[in-house]
Amino acid sequence: VLSLPNTGVNTDKLNILEELVGNFQKDFSFLTVDEIYELIDKIESRPKKYSAFVSGAAAALACGAFIFLLGGGWPEMICSFVGAGLGNFTRAKMGKQKITTLASTAVGVAIACLTYMACFRILEVAFQVSAQHEAGYIGAMLFVIPGFPFITSMLDISKLDMRSGLERLAYAITITTVATLVGWLVALLFNYHPENFIPLRLSPLLLLLLRLPASFCGVYGFSLMFNLSLIHI
């Protein structure tokens, strides 16, 4: 029985494999089959470039930025920043221990949601923040949304590579379902009722100027989460 303890997107390995395939005729065609297997094994065993702390910080940066792009204000950004950071840090630590993807996703999302609630409660008490800022609750779990597998699954299916496409699609739907159920369960247990975002009341020009760096931060954060080398950013 084949069992994969954990999986995910590793763009560092993807880039190396792409270079290997692209330069195979020129640089690797003289290798024996065993040598090629050994080379691929070395690529497969490459450790991640970034620690769990950096992965957590990257998730915090990305989710804090994207919650602003979705319409959230500074309370949502702060709470999402802290929640996503701790959630992805936990998920990364569990991944290093070879704990299954579904378990690490569920625990990571639960911690992210609980941290958002705790952080929001502190802001409520300290700064009398409106309860409507609960709307950013979903931002704390954005780090688990499998956008990469969703997109690549559609590309595979469009090329009639049904096996790869359906496998990736099933993986993406499973992760999304687990994250949604955990987020809903935590909100239900603590009687949390996120509503729509409060309007930011910013001018179109100021909103544009703020969205530009927020977009960069969001993409940069997710790039680090996907183990992309800084040389390729």
Ranges and model annotations:
Residues 49-152, 221-227:
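Core alpha-helical transmembrane segments of integral membrane proteins
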Residues 1-38, 42:
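Soluble N-terminal domains of membrane-associated systems
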Residues 99, 130-131, 156-166:
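Juxtamembrane helix-boundary/capping and inter-helix hinge elements in multi-pass membrane proteins
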Residues 213-223:
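Oxyanion-binding "anion nests"
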Residues 116-125, 181-191:
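Hydrophobic alpha-helical transmembrane segments in multi-pass integral membrane proteins
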Residues 231-233:
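Conserved small/polar residues in nucleotide/adenosyl-binding loops
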Residues 124-132, 191-203:
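Membrane-interface helix termini and inter-helical loops of multi-pass transporters
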Residues 156, 166-175, 187, 206-208, ...:
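Extended, low-hydrophobicity, polar/charged segments
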